[in-house]
A protein has these predicted regions:
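Short, surface-exposed secondary-structure boundary micro-motifs
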Residues: 4, 28-29, 68, 84, ...
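Glycine-rich beta-strand-centered segment in the early N-terminal region that forms part
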Residues: 14-30, 44-91, 130-132
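NAD(P)H dinucleotide-binding glycine-rich loop of Rossmann-like/cofactor-binding domains
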Residues: 87-165
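Mid-domain Rossmann-like dinucleotide-binding core that forms the NAD(H)/NADP(H) cofactor-binding site
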Residues: 133-212
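Glycine-rich cofactor phosphate-binding loops and adjacent beta1-alpha1 units
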Residues: 154, 181, 197-272
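N-terminal Rossmann-fold cofactor-binding loop
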Residues: 189-192, 227, 251, 277
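C-terminal hydrophobic helical "lid"/dimerization subdomain
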Residues: 235, 239, 281-334
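Rossmann-fold dehydrogenase core element
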Residues: 246, 260-300
Length: 334
């Protein structure tokens, strides 16, 4: 539990109350996300996080019990939960934009997440896992849904080229999911040799170290996806598309980060910049489907796992990023 910024405690708390329409899930695995580190550091806008906070919006587990009104899940079912606990009633939810729910509530930010051993979630955000999908892979469904929604908004056609700027977890998932669109080529751009090696392993046709500032295929790519969350990354992303190309910004959001790009670069080259945040419940379901069908494999993206009590080591690894660091998992015992 993060009591307040920079202060973490291990504490026994009462078992969360499982309401009639809720599911009580025993968390087995939780992914360490850059956003979790921002919550610990107090860098996230207070509109989106409530302290004390039990993080963990990327996680998977097993049903412990269900509320009286839940008929289609049972104890022992393997499940994964969407982070956004959307209301299903507001204007945005009725339009299918569940990620923009007017009653913002999110596991791991405003209610207890998968770093805790027991999590309560509304039935509508709980998905039973198909037999073929492992609990490890299920942890990555949340960030994969963020990526897939961004790709769908960019509308890549078969035979087009896709550039991926940044090859952390989001970038690795973008390389993986981009193959679903039958691209002519996927080019991954990064600044660390180890991460570029992982991108190649995941199916990138070409990788480019851009630490020196130069990048191949400038002005040549059909679709570019920015995943790095750094100002230089979005600046590079605006140089890569062809005239009429599309740019999806997935990682750049955050306090103090600004988009400062010459207007002519957009206007005179007819570029489209797409901001994409989160995922809808419909996109989440599609990620589960492609995993179950064996069309994608997330297992190579998981590179490290720690017992939950060693979360500090996991956070340190994510921050220092020595060697190949993909998704880092925390594992609950028992």
């Amino acid at each position: 539990m993060i009591e307040r910024p920079h202060e973490v405690v291990f504490r026994e708390v009462e078992t969360p109350v499982c309401g009639p329409g809720d599911v009580l899930v025993r968390s087995k695995l939780a992914g360490v996300c850059r956003t979790d580190i921002e919550v610990l550091a107090g860098e996230l806008d207070r509109r989106w996080v409530r302290y004390p906070c039990i993080p963990g919006h990327e996680w998977s587990g097993v049903v412990e019990s269900v509320g009286a009104d839940v008929r289609d899940l049972a104890a022992g079912d393997r499940v994964v939960c969407e982070g956004f606990c959307y209301c299903g009633k507001c204007r945005r939810c009725r339009a299918g934009d569940t990620h923009l729910c007017e009653e913002y509530d999110q596991l791991g930010f405003t209610r207890g997440g998968g770093y805790g051993e027991l999590v309560v979630a509304p039935r509508r955000v709980v998905h039973r896992l198909p037999e073929r999908v492992s609990l490890d892979a299920a942890v990555l469904i949340e960030p994969a849904s963020v990526v897939l929604r961004g790709l769908l908004r960019a509308r890549p056609a078969a035979g087009e080229s896709i550039g991926v700027v940044g090859v952390g977890t989001l970038g690795a998932l973008t390389v993986t999911l981009a193959r679903l669109f039958s691209p002519a080529t996927v080019v991954a751009y990064g600044v660390r040799r180890e991460e570029l090696e992982l991108a190649r392993l995941l199916g990138a046709d070409e990788t480019a170290d851009v630490s020196g500032g130069k990048a191949p295929h400038e002005g040549d790519l059909d679709v570019v996806v920015e995943t790095a969350g750094a100002v230089p990354a979005i600046e590079l992303a605006t140089r890569l598309p062809r005239e009429g190309g599309r740019i999806v910004a997935l990682g750049i959001a955050g306090e103090g980060r600004e988009l400062c790009v010459p207007a002519d670069r957009f206007v005179l080259r007819d570029l489209e910049l797409i901001g994409s945040v989160g995922y809808t419940t419909a996109v989440w379901g599609r990620v589960v489907e492609v995993l179950a069908a064996g069309l994608v494999d997330f297992d190579p993206i998981v590179t490290h796992r720690f017992p939950a009590e060693r979360f500090e080591d996991a956070f340190r690894l994510m921050t220092e990023r020595e060697g190949i660091v993909g998704k880092v998992l925390l594992e609950h015992g028992g």
